[in-house]
């Protein structure tokens, strides 16, 4: 036609001109509207109807809903269950086709008349359509289509391992993909394997900056992890991140917490060096040493109960703080001060071995 090959914005004006010249244009006016743009190129997105492949979800969703409601699968923290059930109870059919250059190609085949069959291989399609002149659909699968099969597709080459590893115990992931990935894996597990893919799902929060903005390249508010590790050490960064990660809530990243984590790692290292410099004297512990050792062992026992409770409830930041206080306050600030020998004196061999044992436990 007359507009073929034109830039879309130029074509719009050309169409309006032709309509006007034909006396068919009633009115033109400016409208304020929300215009979608590509995240990568910022180009204006043009909505248009197209043929796509859909997966009917109504038959797949019920076992996945029942599995969570019956606690066959438990979501942590508890409020994520409400989000999950809302998505599942209002589910729409899944558009699984994508117009991309890469991915798993749609296994649909066409003959010259447009007849279509879905087959695993070209040979099966040729037989089904009764002609060698077949072409495969050029679309590829949505990336989540392969991902929802992940809990058991990884065992395709080693099926004997599936009985041991499937279902697995715990999945740790982000709340932003609760429907895109987690819900679909649950549906696939019940549909294709007849059982859940995992027992527990722990949802982490979103990492945000101190202004509560999502970390992104576009905003430039995301620090380079390698730079943080170079400055504070890997353990320092881990501790700093966990300090601000209450169960399931968003994580407000503050670099000062990585610094605090680094101080904690140094505290552990300095305590190790201190114990390594002790010289031994008598074999048996003194009464004061025995009192300190027994007290520290009792504190470890109490902390283990707290840790068991925190981990069972997936409260990882609380577990970290229990460990932090046990090491920094109880072990370093109290126990070592009670046991370490005065200048020029020695610690008993039994107390030193007990201290090393406590160190290993910590």
Predicted segments with their positions:
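Proline-centered turn/helix-capping motifs that create local helix->coil transitions or kinks
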Residues: 193-195, 269-284
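A short secondary-structure junction motif
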Residues: 147, 151-155, 210, 243-244, ...
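Alpha-helical recognition segments enriched in aromatics with Gly/Pro capping
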Residues: 1, 99-249
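Residue patterns forming the tRNA-binding/recognition surfaces of aminoacyl-tRNA synthetases
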Residues: 1-112, 213, 219-264, 269, ...
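Acidic, turn-prone loop/beta-hairpin segments
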Residues: 110, 134, 209, 242, ...
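Short alpha-helical functional segments enriched in proximate histidine and acidic residues
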Residues: 94, 98, 180, 185-189, ...
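Residue-level signal for inorganic ion chemistry
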Residues: 42, 204-205, 268, 331
């Amino acid at each position: 036609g007359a507009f073929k090959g034109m830039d879309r914005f130029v074509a719009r004006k050309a169409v309006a001109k032709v309509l006007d010249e034909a006396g068919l244009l009633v009115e033109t006016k400016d409208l304020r509207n929300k215009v979608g743009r590509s995240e990568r190129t910022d180009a204006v997105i043009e909505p248009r109807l197209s043929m796509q492949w859909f997966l009917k979800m109504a038959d797949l969703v019920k076992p996945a809903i029942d599995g969570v409601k019956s606690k066959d699968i438990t979501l942590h923290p508890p409020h994520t269950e409400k989000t999950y059930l809302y998505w599942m109870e209002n589910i729409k059919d899944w558009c699984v086709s994508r117009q991309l250059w890469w991915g798993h190609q749609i296994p649909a085949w066409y003959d010259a008349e447009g007849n279509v069959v879905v087959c695993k291989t070209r040979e099966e399609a040729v037989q089904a359509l009764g002609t060698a002149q077949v072409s495969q659909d050029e679309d590829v699968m949505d990336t989540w289509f392969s991902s929802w099969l992940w809990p058991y597709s990884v065992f395709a080459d080693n099926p004997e391992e599936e009985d041991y590893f499937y279902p697995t115990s715990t999945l740790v992931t982000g709340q932003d993909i609760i429907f895109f990935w987690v819900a679909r894996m649950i549906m696939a597990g019940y549909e294709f394997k007849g059982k859940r893919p995992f027992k527990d799902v722990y949802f982490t929060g979103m990492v945000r900056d101190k202004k509560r903005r999502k970390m992104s390249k576009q905003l430039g508010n995301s620090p380079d992890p390698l730079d943080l590790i170079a400055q504070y050490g890997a353990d320092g960064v881990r501790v700093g991140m966990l300090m601000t990660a209450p169960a399931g809530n968003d994580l407000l990243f503050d670099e000062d917490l990585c610094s605090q984590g680094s101080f904690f790692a140094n505290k552990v290292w300095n305590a190790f060096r201190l114990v390594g410099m002790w010289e031994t004297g008598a074999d048996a512990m003194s009464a004061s040493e025995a009192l300190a050792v027994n007290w520290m062992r009792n504190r470890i026992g109490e902390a283990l109960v707290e840790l068991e409770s925190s981990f069972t409830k997936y409260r990882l930041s609380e577990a970290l703080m229990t460990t932090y206080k046990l090491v920094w306050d109880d072990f370093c600030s109290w126990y070592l001060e009670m046991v370490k020998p005065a200048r020029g004196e020695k610690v008993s061999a039994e107390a030193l071995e007990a201290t090393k044992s406590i160190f290993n436990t910590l």
